[in-house]
Curated annotation (Swiss-Prot):
Sequence ranges of Low complexity compositional bias: 492-507, 559-589, 599-614, 687-698
Protein name: Homeobox protein araucan
Gene source species: Drosophila melanogaster
UniProt family annotation: Belongs to the TALE/IRO homeobox family.
Keyword Membrane: no
Top-rank taxon: Eukaryota
């Protein structure tokens, strides 16, 4: 009961506080009634005990004294306490007073509770039933004990004193609410009684006469605790009497960790961790949390500090780790103000920083190129396709001429779609190594690395050739270095090519030249081989026809009137093309190339010369590596579509170019192409089933079919 009353959870005083030591009857103790009257002025707490006698802090009058108020406003320590009332009790007949009507002694007769309510014992007698207080009024009479409960009013002096010193709290360890209303207290859970967690320290209500007597000394030593309204931090964080006043958890009700500036002491731990992990200065999430706890920093501050530290080391050219692309370390933008100030104060290392950043970018580009190389397939195939000497290079300075499938640049690879000008350049230069008349082109073929420095404007050292990435291939205005120097001087190349053609006509009879060039239509150079199965069932027949008829220029953005002389030039170079597909009105060139008049050949050469001069103005526009759904060459007139051969003729063409049926010795050529029959025929047979229905009814195709039948029968027999 005493502990319960001490912390202010109940308004009932204990029996020892209500009764003096001389009256210890159970009846009187149980007869005391505490009624809260006028709570705005009268507190609900028990009066303080006097340190001298253990009695109530109320002055006792000697018996037989004069009637009246014994403590009319006296404030001395031996007089009434601050919360006591100057109430006089009319004694009963059996009291200890000398006179019958004199005032009774408070120690023997009545008692006062904490609310200023006087209790009068009515144990029978002649003088019972008087007024309980001078200015009080009786409230009720106890039916059990017959005592009269009356309420005594305060005078103005005591009311002012009580409101000054005892209004928030009335006794030791018992406190009232620090908030006048609940509207001003936003946190009701930590409201009234939360100050009971604090240990007594001092009396914040220091009265002027604190050292005037033992009672005031007792007040000071007991030490009234200030209420929660005087503290700026959450009292719930101080369980067990721990007073955390300067910690980072103060000044807020939500117990959140307070962000503070990073000091040298806190960052010393981070620097030590960074020095130990220079190979991999990327702390994990758990390590960041551990470092944040040790340094009393937030997790964001730790991550920002490490990002800034890595950036500083990069700038100072002290980078000892491989750059990583990690999503959880993309907080380089979270640079704190003090870190920015530190970087501004540091001397700028502009040249070293730019060099190191350029090195980092070069490393990242090389990594990306390596990834592209892994995705595209074997490096040997790609190097041979780009013009580098491969393992199967022939002795005649012709890359990929050794007969091995790995060194063959036109070898089938499902994801290996070369640049469109790749086939064109190979086709233009395909006759030159075969005739072998120009030594300059031979030297260009033998040293392809010399062309690396001038393509795409990206210098790459000759000692370390790299596979070009797909992004460079698509984005460059000039073609990638895959053409062995043929595209560097197109006009000069065209002139040399025409000279080679004239020499070929003088070297062989006209009929043999036509047959020979028809024999090597697409087979003299491996670049000319149409990719018969590269598109499988997707666009197998159509792309096969395009590759065959359009001479390995699968996608051309030139208008039809410009395509026609270009294709005529290609037919002139190859000698025995079946027909043209530039437009529906284009001339159909028969196979009898040797029957053509020399004047007509000269006219065609002049046309090709004009086309070459147009080409000298710039290269063909770079095309994407992946084919579109509808290639531009498919958007020709329907009459031109009827001129396309069916896919059933493509394996015949492949058979013809692989055959040795004309009686020429195989040793007269750089390689024996009949050895490639096993390489080409399965893929050609695979795609032979995809025939185009739009071209099956053409009479010209039937005529061409009749021309090929004897060759096919002769080879199979």
């Amino acid at each position: 009961m005493a502990a319960y009353t001490q912390f202010g959870y109940g308004g009932f005083p204990s029996a020892s506080q209500l009764l003096p030591p001389s009256v210890q009857t159970t009846e009187d103790a149980s007869a005391n009634v505490n009624v809260n009257v006028n709570e705005a002025l009268v507190m609900t707490n028990a009066p303080a005990m006097s340190p001298t006698g253990g009695q109530d802090c109320q002055g006792s009058q000697p018996s037989g004294g004069a009637g009246g108020d014994a403590s009319s406003g006296a404030l001395s320590p031996n007089a009434l306490s601050q919360n006591s009332n100057a109430a006089t009790v009319v004694g009963a007949g059996g009291g200890s007073s000398a006179g019958g009507g004199g005032p009774a002694d408070l120690a023997t007769g009545g008692s006062l509770d904490g609310n200023g309510v006087g209790t009068t014992p009515t144990a029978g007698g002649a003088g019972g039933g008087g007024s309980c207080c001078e200015n009080g009024r009786p409230i009720m009479t106890d039916p059990v004990s017959g005592q009269t409960v009356c309420s005594c009013q305060y005078d103005s002096a005591r009311l002012a004193l009580s409101s000054y010193s005892r209004l928030p709290a009335a006794s030791v360890g018992v406190y009232g609410t620090p908030y006048p209303s609940t509207d001003q207290n936003p946190y009701q859970s930590i409201g009234v009684d939360s100050s009971a967690f604090y240990s007594p320290l001092s009396n914040p209500y220091g009265l002027k006469d604190t050292g005037a007597g033992p009672e005031m000394g007792a007040w000071t030593s007991a030490g009234l605790q200030p209420t929660t309204g005087y503290y700026s931090y959450d009292p719930m964080s101080a369980y067990g009497g721990l007073l955390v006043s300067n910690s980072s958890y103060g000044a807020s009700y939500d117990l959140a960790a307070r962000r503070k500036n990073a000091t040298r002491e806190s960052t010393a731990t981070l620097k030590a961790w960074l020095n130990e992990h220079k190979k991999n200065p990327y702390p994990t999430k758990g390590e960041k949390i551990m470092l944040a706890i040790i340094t009393k920093m937030t997790l964001t501050q730790v991550s920002t500090w490490f990002a800034n530290a890595r950036r500083r080391l990069k700038k100072e050219n002290k980078m000892t780790w491989e750059p990583k692309n990690r999503t959880d370390d993309d907080d380089d933008a979270l640079v704190s103000d003090d870190e920015k100030d530190k970087e501004d104060l540091e001397p700028s290392k502009g040249s070293q920083g730019s060099v190191s950043l350029a090195k980092d970018e070069t490393k990242e580009e090389e990594d990306a190129i390596d990834e592209d190389q892994k995705c595209l397939g074997q490096a040997n195939i790609l190097r041979a396709g780009f013009g580098y000497p491969s393992a199967g290079s022939g002795s005649g300075g012709y890359p990929g001429g050794g007969g091995s499938s790995s060194g063959h640049p036109g070898g089938y690879h499902p994801y290996h779609h070369q640049h469109p000008a790749y086939y064109q350049a190979g086709q233009q230069g395909g006759m030159l190594p075969f005739h072998g008349e120009n030594s300059k082109l031979q030297t260009d073929l033998g040293d392809p690395k010399n062309q690396l420095g001038r393509d795409c404007g990206v210098p790459i050292p000759a000692t370390k050739p790299k596979i070009w990435s797909l992004a460079d291939t698509v984005g460059c205005k000039t073609p990638p270095p895959a053409y062995m120097g043929h595209q560097s001087m197109p006009l000069q190349q065209q002139q040399q090519q025409q000279q080679q053609q004239q020499q070929a006509q003088h070297q062989y009879p006209p009929s043999e030249a036509g047959r020979d060039q028809q024999l090597f239509n697409g087979a003299a150079a491996p670049y000319l081989r149409p990719h018969t199965t590269a598109y499988g069932g997707f666009l197998g027949a159509t792309t096969q026809q395009l590759h065959t008829t359009n001479n390995s220029i699968p996608y051309s953005n030139m208008p039809p009137q410009q395509q026609q002389p270009q294709q005529q030039q290609q037919q002139l170079q190859q000698g025995g093309t079946i027909h043209t597909t530039g437009s529906s009105s284009g001339p159909i060139i028969p196979l009898q190339f040797h029957n053509r008049h020399p004047q007509q050949q000269q006219q065609l050469q002049q046309q090709s010369q004009s086309t070459a001069s147009q080409r000298a103005m710039g290269f063909l526009e770079a095309q994407p590596d992946t084919p579109p759904q509808t290639p531009p060459n498919m958007k020709v007139l329907s009459g031109a579509l009827s001129l396309l051969p069916t896919a059933t003729q493509v394996p015949m063409t492949a058979t013809c170019r692989s055959s040795n049926a004309f009686g020429f010795p195989a040793s007269g050529y750089p390689m024996n192409f009949s050895a490639r029959l096993g390489e080409y025929s399965p893929r050609d047979d695979y795609s032979s089933g995809n025939s185009s229905s739009s071209s099956s009814s053409s009479p010209q195709l039937q005529r061409n079919e009749a021309m090929f039948k004897p060759l096919f029968k002769k080879f199979t027999n």
